């Protein structure tokens, strides 16, 4: 890279070369190259912001003009954030961003503090200035489809499909994180009718409430899908049981039902729904 380019420009170009938008991360994992790429715009923006903050600091504090020079101060930068009391989640995000920037592993850096599920605060408190009663149709739609915010924004009537084998409607070709496509069940006839009443080619929802706690509605959807598939724990072979750890110790789930719910949400690992969806729903007063 030319020496006369600013260190910010060097960050931008380095991360831009790693963009794999629209490519399947699953296949990259099979090839062993997944760690080399960035598969979503949101991840790219996060990594870019954290990396730029680092090189600005390295330039101001140590006079660094190239990424190679700044590399010597990565551990100092991470330790600075640990000492300042930044959360383990912020520490890990910084480390992950810089590992992507330098094409290495976070294990090559100063260890960050351990992240604990109990410290996650998203969707555990009511979001101010949002009335679920006044937005009931939208909230019910979210709970019936389990879509992410950007997936709702991009939803068209063409995504609705009738499955003759089951006699039920599905959402098909939903483009999730990293460009992954999935199909997901619709849990209410009202949601189906709302889609059917939308003109072809038009967004199903032209306006999406900015303060809606969509993650919590996805947790409700996950719980419903799980309960529709779950077997009584006592009847499940031990190999099909998922035993939670840490502060969730003692909670047992049906792996098969978890896999169905996980696919419907657009996640590959069932551990994600155990910690961020099923238990999130219990904490808000639900009962599996």
Where are these regions (language model features)?
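Flexible interdomain linker/hinge and immediately adjacent N-terminus
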Residues: 9, 75-84, 99-131, 175-177
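C-terminal catalytic core of Y-nucleophile DNA break-rejoin enzymes
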Residues: 175-221
């Amino acid at each position: 890279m030319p020496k006369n380019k600013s260190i910010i420009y060097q960050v931008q170009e380095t991360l831009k070369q790693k963009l794999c938008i629209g490519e399947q991360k699953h296949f990259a994992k099979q090839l062993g190259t997944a760690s080399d790429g960035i598969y979503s715009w949101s991840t790219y923006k996060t990594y870019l912001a954290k990396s730029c903050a680092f090189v600005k600091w390295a330039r101001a504090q140590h006079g660094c003009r190239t990424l190679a020079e700044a590399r010597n101060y990565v551990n100092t930068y991470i330790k600075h954030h640990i000492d300042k009391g930044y959360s383990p989640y912020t520490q890990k995000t910084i480390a992950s961003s810089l590992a992507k920037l330098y094409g290495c592993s976070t294990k090559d850096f100063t260890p960050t503090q351990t992240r604990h599920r109990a410290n996650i605060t998203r969707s555990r408190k009511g979001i101010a200035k949002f009335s679920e009663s006044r937005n009931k149709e939208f909230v019910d739609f979210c709970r019936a489809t389990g879509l992410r915010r950007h997936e709702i924004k991009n939803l068209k009537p063409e995504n609705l499909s009738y499955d003759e084998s089951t006699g039920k409607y599905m959402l098909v070709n939903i483009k999730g994180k990293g460009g992954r496509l999935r199909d997901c069940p619709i849990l209410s006839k009202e949601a189906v009718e709302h889609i059917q009443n939308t003109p072809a080619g038009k967004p199903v929802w032209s306006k999406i409430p900015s303060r809606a706690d969509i993650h919590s509605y996805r947790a409700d959807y996950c719980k419903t899908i799980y309960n529709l598939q779950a077997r009584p724990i006592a009847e499940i072979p031990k190999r099909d049981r998922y035993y939670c750890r840490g502060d969730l110790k003692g909670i047992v789930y049906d792996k098969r039902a978890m896999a169905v719910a996980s696919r419907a949400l657009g996640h590959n690992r069932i551990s994600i729904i155990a910690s961020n969806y099923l238990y999130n729903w219990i904490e808000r007063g639900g009962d599996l």
